[in-house]
Curated annotation (Swiss-Prot):
GO MF, one annotated term: phosphoglycerate kinase activity
Localisation per UniProt entry: Cytoplasm
Superkingdom in the source lineage: Bacteria
Entry protein name: Phosphoglycerate kinase
Pathway as given in its UniProt record: Carbohydrate degradation; glycolysis; pyruvate from D-glyceraldehyde 3-phosphate: step 2/5
Amino acid sequence: MAVKTLQDLLNEGVEGRGVLVRSDLNVPLDDNGQITDPGRIIASIPTLKALVEAGAKVVVTAHLGRPKGEPDPKFSLAPVAAKLAELLGRNVQLAGDVVGYDALSRSEGLTDGDVLLLENVRFDPRETSKDEAERGKLAAALVELVGEDGAFVSDGFGVVHRKQASVYDVAKLLPHYAGTLVAAEVDVLAKLTDNTERPYAVVLGGSKVSDKLAVIEALAPKVDTLVIGGGMCFTFLAAQGLSVGSSLLQEEMIDTCKGLLERYADVIHLPRDVVVADSFSADAESKCVPANEIPDGWMGLDIGAESVDRFAALLTEAKTVFWNGPMGVFEFEKFAAGTRGVAEAIVAATGKGAFTVVGGGDSAAAVRALGLPEDGFSHISTGGGASLEYLEGKELPGISVLEDTAPEGS
């Protein structure tokens, strides 16, 4: 990645300068507004801490959830500000708006080493606008908060696949740098696409084939093993002519799955047994059945023990592993064994020297929810969608804009 990094900025000197940081602080909250998984906040700390210690006036912009372009208290970054302050060991101011009077007045009052978190950037409809001029106006307002001699650090890998004001347009207006997290993420993903050590195994789960089709098409010709579990496996099983009962099924994708199974018969591995339930609930009646014996009215919610053993045998022999998507409904204890078993096999592969990557999103959440050791994987990505789009070979706007060395008008 031919871009300037945070270290380049620190070498240039940031004491007394305003630095705008786009972090990914989009963490899950419970019904009481409490953070249930602070993983992304924790991942943002190294960049912020380095800037604080170097004496920068740090202004952080980020989003939470999907507000509809206007302020919504349930999507406020207030709990995030409190967690940031705890992890940084210093006060973090929270602006009452995105780029309004409060944000501007607080930014003008910053002293060296201070941190200001702007309110949820998606409270401003211009952030996600398709109109470049509208996004540009918000970007210009963000720049005003750090001044013309300021800098922009892109450290939110989970959003680099979005062409949004705080991710893309602002980088055109300021000297720009990849933060510690973004630089590390891209370096890791490059290892999954360039001169990858074999055997190379990919594990894909999740609910919909349509969500993973592009990455299957991109990776199937390049890998030795492609394990498919989760809700999406039932569309593949249906493509083999099997009855899947009331399991999740994308009928419009059956022919596509047939084609994939024909082309990559030696690469794609499907479950041979599944755990089925009579309803979608934590206390449903459940049983393990062969994949070709799913009863009518029952739905598959996890892969079975035989499948876990088969997949584990493949994964523990791999030298490179990429995992994206759970094997079942791991949030329900009855249907967590498949995800746990596959994850433990990947940890075992890591222990044998394999390079293993968890592709963000639900997979990263599963690692934490199931109490698995995070250091049992070579890397846990903070960006599920961005990881997939990178592996699909798509351009990531928030990365490509960093490769332009000079801001507009300089």
